[in-house]
Design a protein with these regions (language model features):
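Short beta-strand/loop motif that positions the catalytic acidic residue
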Residues: 189-193
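A domain-start/cap signature at the N-terminus of enzymes
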Residues: 1-68
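Active-site machinery of serine-nucleophile hydrolases
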Residues: 66-133
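Acidic beta-to-alpha connecting loop that harbors the catalytic carboxylate
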Residues: 76, 107-108, 194-197, 232-233
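Loop/turn elements at helix/coil->beta-strand transitions in domains of secreted/extracellular proteins
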Residues: 65-69, 98-102, 138-142, 161-167, ...
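C-terminal catalytic histidine-bearing segment of alpha/beta-hydrolase fold enzymes
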Residues: 197, 203-293
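Gly/Ser-rich "nucleophile elbow"/oxyanion-hole loop immediately N-terminal to the catalytic nucleophile
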Residues: 60-65, 113-149, 160-164
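Primarily recognizes the serine-hydrolase "nucleophile elbow" in alpha/beta-hydrolase
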Residues: 140-184
Length: 293
């Protein structure tokens, strides 16, 4: 039985529900393939009037027919378009995973908070789903990383979009108002120069190291993390931060974890893993801790 119409209008068994999920995905994927066929060649997506340009390189061979995806965020921010373009060019070649699609997007804006504006969330959702359909990306092996202002973005996006990531790597950034609660079910690594004193980045990295350590002590099944502070380095870590990639690669996303910690950032969401709320209930600062047996 491969017909959705047969399943409509009645309750479903567990097996039928799984089948319906597969059928709905097949139908959606076919539509997406048709509508987004030129995206990879164009190197650009537009969602709700906001454009995100990107460039990518493919490394290694697929694993069981699927590829990992590394989304790597450039630095800059709060400067000229030309300066941010230069940062983007640098980010395109900054890291080299052993396997997967290494994709460096160009932030749509040139503001200081270029990677944690509200439009970034829906752009990345669209980007990930496109690569799942068009480039055989494994949705459970999607990784986020970023340097400097890109690291600022990772601090923000890793917890608030944690249900999309397997792991995330923050390099040389500052969290601003971000909190780590949503990181419960992903791997999170933080790399910082011990002499990176601007905006107290080095001190804040140590605070997050302690914070993550306490979260894991209180919840030993969650908050897997690795923090590396290099005492000899300032803002530039001379490539030592690339050690984050093989550490991240050991993680796979669990779409249905038994325990979820959901913190609403200033950019709110109406769903997180298997939880959902109405738009009216998605309030900044709300925290939900939910478990299933």
């Amino acid at each position: 039985m491969r017909d959705l119409d047969v399943l409509r209008g009645r309750g479903l068994t567990r097996e039928e529900a799984l089948l319906a999920t597969d059928l709905l995905w097949e139908e959606l994927a076919q539509t997406m393939k048709s509508e987004r066929a030129s995206v990879l060649e164009d190197g650009s997506i537009v969602v709700e009037g906001v454009e995100l340009k990107f460039a990518f390189t493919v490394f290694g061979e697929p694993v069981e027919g699927k590829r990992s995806l590394y989304i790597s965020l450039h630095g800059g921010g709060g400067t000229t378009p030309e300066a941010n373009d230069k940062q983007w060019e640098n980010q395109k070649k900054l890291y080299k995973p052993t396997e997967g699609i290494y994709l460096a997007p160009r932030a749509p804006s040139n503001d200081w908070d270029l990677w944690h504006k509200p439009h970034i969330d829906f752009l990345f959702d669209y980007l990930i789903s496109t690569l799942v359909v068009l480039a055989d990306v494994d949705p459970n092996r999607v990784y986020l990383l970023g340097y400097s202002a890109g690291g600022d973005g990772v601090y923000q996006l890793a917890p608030r979009m944690a249900d999309r990531w397997a792991a995330a790597g923050m390099m040389a950034g500052h969290p601003n108002d971000a909190k780590p609660y949503g990181l419960r079910n992903i791997g999170f690594t933080l790399h910082m120069g011990g002499q990176d004193t601007a905006y107290r980045r080095n001190e804040v990295a140590k605070e997050w190291q302690d914070w993550l350590g306490q979260l894991q002590a209180d919840d030993p099944e969650g908050y897997k993390h690795w923090v590396e502070i290099y005492p000899q380095h300032g803002h530039w870590m001379e490539g030592e931060d690339a050690s984050a990639l093989p550490w991240m690669a050991q993680f796979k996303r669990n779409p249905y974890p038994k325990r979820v910690v959901w913190w609403q950032d200033d950019v709110t969401h109406t769903r997180f893993y298997w939880l959902a709320v109405t738009a009216a209930e998605a309030v900044e600062g709300a925290k939900v801790v939910a478990s299933v047996q």
